[in-house]
From Swiss-Prot:
Main location as per UniProt: mitochondrion
Region (Disordered): 466-487
Compartments it resides in: Mitochondrion
Name this polypeptide is given: Pentatricopeptide repeat-containing protein At5g61370, mitochondrial
Length: 487
């Protein structure tokens, strides 16, 4: 009995020892692989050395590449490393792994290169993809086509679409819609229409997406006539335009009227909104913001305020964007009191704008030389506790000091340091002996006007002095008068 117990204890001890050995060995291997991974990431992400140096350094690392390692390295380095270094690392991995790499790794790297908009790197990898008979998935093609069109290579995007079968990727509803969307995103609508007519049979079920893309493309070109025709084609096909379609038409119309007919902005936009309601589609704050943005660019102050009030009456609550466009045009046209009043109204209604709202408007006020109003708006920003005050301090302190208000500039500097805000501007700005004080632009313009007027008066006086006096010629007697005298 005792010998049996001893044997059992011995077996248990040996089993536990074996488990501990395996545990420590596995942890040692994990540590080694983690170290190798970090070393590869360091080499790939290093900005020092060329591409040949990169490959040479990778060869010196004692690491066995794997699909998982490739994905991890690319994911870790994609944001801060140049696409060419990522491509060279992937090529080095392909040499080591060969057919062990799956199609999904090729597609992943191609999507990363497309996101980084490196046309040459994309072409190299697409060529490798085709040589090795790899399959490109539909999502990858969509991203590649969109990127190529963005960088002005729409012909390349169409070329890849035509030979999708060589990438084992079908020309189905998804890929046809993707190439049409990519082309229309930069206004190449005629090319998109060509693709659409050649593949009518495969876009069945995706008609709404295709019409949306066409409308967006015509809005990029500001072609209201063609955009209207697309809406009519949708009605003829029994497809009801949605909010996106009407907003695209509204954008097209408003952008065209900014340059051609600013006074027609409001009536024509309201007609489109009336048409939207006939389809039981209520205009949203985004619809109104399209109009408000264009009204602001044309400095239509009264219409901007009226549209804001109309939004409230119609039950469409303005958002922070609506208030921003109206306040901005008020500040730019010198209606500072009215602008501040609308900001207060927005805060009272419970809106909590993001820091960009305040930062942009403070920039506008500084640009029109109204730093006192900018300081008031900054106080409202601090009361709302949105954070991100560093940029505002960096804007206001130089503006105050260069305007001669060193006392207020120093006060803001000390305030920023007290709340641990890191400033980018130099402390030398607070020194009047170093910082040059600029006169306001209006004073300079007025002085220039006075100088111009004085110069014009001098020129006219000089011309009057040198101008020779002309003797008036005696009037000739008419023939009738001579005859009368003779009689």
């Amino acid at each position: 009995m005792m010998s049996t117990t001893v044997r059992l204890n011995r077996f248990t001890y040996l089993t536990s020892t074996a488990k501990l050995t395996r545990y420590f060995c596995s942890h040692h291997l994990v540590d080694r692989s983690e170290t190798a991974l970090h070393e590869v990431i360091r080499i790939v992400s290093s900005p020092v050395g060329g591409l040949d140096d990169l490959e040479e350094n990778l060869n010196q690392v004692s690491v066995s590449p794997s699909s998982n390692l490739v994905t991890q390295v690319i994911e870790s380095c994609k944001n801060e490393t140049s696409p060419r270094r990522l491509l060279r690392f992937f090529s080095w991995s392909c040499k080591s792994l060969g057919s062990s790499l799956h199609d999904k790794e090729f597609n992943y790297v191609l999507r990363v290169l497309a996101e980084k908009k490196d046309h040459t790197a994309m072409q190299i990898l697409l060529s490798d993809l085709r040589k090795e008979n790899r399959a490109m998935d539909k999502q990858t093609f969509s991203i590649v086509a969109e990127t190529l069109v963005k960088v002005g290579k729409e012909e390349d995007a169409i070329g890849i679409f035509k030979i999708l079968d060589k990438f084992s990727c079908p020309q189905d509803g998804f890929t046809v819609t993707a190439i049409i969307s990519a082309l229309c995103s930069r206004g190449h609508v005629k090319r998109a229409l060509g693709v659409m007519h050649h593949h009518k049979d495969v876009i069945s079920g995706n008609e709404l997406s295709v019409y949306r893309s066409l409308l967006f493309g015509w809005s990029v070109q500001r072609n209201v006539k063609e955009a209207r025709r697309v809406i009519q084609d949708m009605k003829s096909a029994g497809i009801t335009p949605d909010l996106f379609c009407f907003n695209s038409l509204l954008t097209c119309l408003c952008e065209r009227n900014v340059n051609r007919n600013p006074s027609g902005l409001v009536p024509e936009a309201l007609n489109i909104m009336l048409e939207m309601r006939s389809y039981k589609i209520q205009p949203t704050s985004m619809s109104y913001n399209i109009l408000l943005s264009c009204l602001g660019r044309t400095r239509r102050v009264r219409e901007s305020c009226q549209i804001l009030e109309q939004m409230k009456r119609s039950g469409c609550d303005p958002d922070t964007g609506s208030y921003y466009f109206v306040v901005r045009v008020l500040y730019l046209t010198g209606r500072f009191g009215k602008g501040n009043q609308i900001v207060d109204e927005m805060i009272e209604r419970g809106f909590r704008p993001e820091r960009k709202f305040y930062y942009d408007l403070i920039g506008v006020l500084c640009g029109v030389e109204r730093v006192n109003f900018a300081l008031q708006l900054f106080e409202k920003m601090k009361r709302s506790s949105v954070g991100g005050y560093g940029q505002v301090y960096d804007l206001l302190i130089p503006k105050l000091c260069k305007g001669g208000n060193f006392e207020k500039g120093r006060e803001l500097w000390e305030e920023a340091l007290s709340i641990d805000v890191t400033l980018s501007c130099s402390i030398s700005l607070l020194d009047p002996s170093v910082t040059e004080v600029f006169k306001p632009m209006k004073m300079k313009e007025e002085a220039a006007m006075v100088d111009r007027r004085a110069l014009n008066l001098k020129i006219h006086a000089r011309m009057n002095k040198t101008k020779p006096k002309l003797k008036l010629k005696p009037k000739r007697r008419s023939k009738t008068k001579k005859k009368n005298l003779q009689h």
